[in-house]
């Protein structure tokens, strides 16, 4: 399938089965997302995998009542921790006084997703 066909056939799923997702598939999805372009190869995001039903239900409430039947939630968070360590190793200041790193981390997280 070429890129145009892929984009034209996109659809959004809002109702999920409760069928468990094999760990191998979860790992493959995370590995595939990690191959997306990102800022300076720093991958300014973290992925939290939630599989416990009570935690999924709690997250559902925080996400304006989105369904909680899915067997897992992947929460992708903008995270500049790697950049913080990179600056420390090089003895340079961390320029968090601007929005560039927030935007970079947000774009990285979005591309991963």
Language-model-detected regions and their locations in the chain:
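Acidic, surface-exposed loops and disordered segments
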Residues: 1-113
